[in-house]
Amino acid sequence: INHGETIWRTFESQVRETVGLSEDETRIYSKTMNDSIVCFATQGNTPKKLWASNVGFGYEHAPSMPQEKEGVMYGSTKEGLIFALNAQTGEVIWKHKIGNSLINTVVPLNKKEVLFTATSGEVGLLRMK
């Protein structure tokens, strides 16, 4: 796209600036302002919602972007929660609370390891079993 025009827009989900792109660039993920992650197809001239997942994080406005690695979509919240979803279905794989401070955009290294930083100063590596 070289023209800068809006291809499609939807008001179906109440999202903010938290948009992430899948590794294969066929899906976009966004955190809603209340509890959920939504996933839309990138192809086409009309919005096509693929799934929505209620992660249960409550009211949310942190600008951390969803990230995908090896079929897992990772996200974080203003309340110290990091979570992982199946990128194809939106099924919650796990949730882990780091603390009570905002977690910045996480950096998944692979399917089992995620780097994170928090606004309270923590820097860490989560390893899943």
Q: Where are the predicted features?
A:
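Short loop/turn segments that connect beta-strands within beta-propeller blades
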Residues: 1-3, 42-46, 86-90, 128-129
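C-terminal soluble interaction/assembly domains
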Residues: 56, 81-82, 87, 97
